Amino acid sequence: IPDFRMNVNVSYVQILQGNVERDILDAIQKYSLQTECLCVEMTESGFMDMTPSFCKFRKTLDKNGIPFVIDDFGTGYSNLHCIRDMNPSYVKMDRDFTAKAMNSDRDYELYKNIIPMVHCINVRICAEGIEEKEWLLKMKEMKVDYLQGYYFGRPCGKEQFLQQYASGINVK
């Protein structure tokens, strides 16, 4: 399989319950994974704070070179305090936010101006929900770092994934 990064979702609640970082490190060892090929996304469903459990979790990820991502940025409680306090490797702009930006001048301007603001503190941006070539081109124009969406491929099982991507040639 060519080089790729696999993202794993964890919730803030899982982090607070403790030892999710141990489960991640155990899986890395068990499957002989390279830490730079794994990325941990924190799904966001409520208020998040810098609790001792969260600080331990982040410290473990940093110590082991595992990127940390705030998922669904632009919705709910994921806000600027999350970026400031949690110091993610990158944030994933919510797919609905992306879709609105592609269909509204006002939302486009907001989206476009979030990118340099986040870049200036060395946090990268992933745009979720890229479904059309036109959206891809607009995101490149805005200097979005990573892109994700059905334009590139739909969710699939292991066998289909290996068939599609094992040769490394099915990338748009």
Positions of PLM-derived features:
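EAL-family c-di-GMP phosphodiesterase catalytic domain
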Residues: 11-18, 37-51, 64-172
